[in-house]
């Protein structure tokens, strides 16, 4: 009998079966999202329709931390560059990842880890966070950092709205060279007014 049903589900009723599977998978995803919103106390963001990029967050925190520190931040074309500096373990990387995860969750229709979040739709999100060297290819950490930044600049020079996250820029070289390279990159990125940038060092 199972073979009989299986035969018809794969043949005569194949399109109906696929449609039911699609509906069920969507319901399962929506239910899981609803459970996550309630479990983690997430709030739904407000999307603003405008041509310029915007992220306005109140009480933003990292969703994976049990005792997170909440941040307030606002970024727009007039203030499109957030430069983070401070001692190690001060929370720079955590803030960058909190912003990135909140913006990503908002774009997939999820609640976000914040009291309130207003933002525009972004055309893309780019991160330069986990850069690695490649000994087999003879590529140093610094080389791959430069390549990632180069690829980032090439992508965002298209007039679209991007959120760009860069953690500890040029840490693969000495302090003086890192400072010179960072200043050059920052000055170039600040000219791209249609995108928002968060960079730590």
Where are these regions (language model features)?
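ATPase nucleotide-binding head domains, primarily ABC-like/P-loop NTPase cores
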Residues: 36-201
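Extended non-transmembrane interhelical loops and adjacent amphipathic helices
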Residues: 21-28, 50-56
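A conserved P-loop NTPase coupling/switch region
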Residues: 1-24
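Short intracellular "coupling" helices and adjacent cytoplasmic loop segments at the cytosolic face
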Residues: 10, 32-38
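Secondary-structure edge/capping motif, primarily at the C-terminal ends of alpha-helices
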Residues: 4-7, 34, 156
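A structural signal for well-ordered alpha-helices, especially hydrophobic packing surfaces
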Residues: 24, 28-31, 150-153
């Amino acid at each position: 009998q199972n073979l009989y049903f299986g035969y018809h589900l794969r043949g005569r009723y194949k399109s109906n079966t696929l449609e039911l599977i699609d509906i069920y998978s969507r319901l399962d995803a929506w239910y899981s999202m609803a459970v996550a919103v309630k479990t983690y106390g997430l709030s739904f963001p407000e999307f603003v329709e405008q041509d310029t990029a915007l992220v306005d967050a109140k009480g933003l925190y990292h969703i994976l931390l049990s005792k997170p520190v909440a941040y307030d931040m606002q970024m727009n074309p007039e203030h499109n560059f957030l430069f983070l500096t401070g001692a190690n373990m001060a929370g720079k990387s955590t803030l960058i990842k909190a912003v990135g995860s909140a913006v990503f969750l908002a774009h997939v229709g999820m609640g976000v880890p914040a009291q309130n979040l207003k933002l525009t739709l972004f055309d893309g999100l780019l991160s330069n966070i986990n850069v690695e060297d490649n000994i087999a290819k003879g590529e140093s950490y610094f080389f791959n950092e430069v390549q990632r930044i180069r690829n980032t600049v090439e992508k965002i020079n298209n007039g679209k709205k991007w959120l760009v996250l860069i953690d500890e820029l040029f840490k693969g070289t000495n302090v003086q060279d890192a400072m010179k390279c960072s200043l050059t990159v920052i000055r170039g990125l600040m000219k791209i007014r249609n995108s928002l940038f968060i960079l730590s060092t």
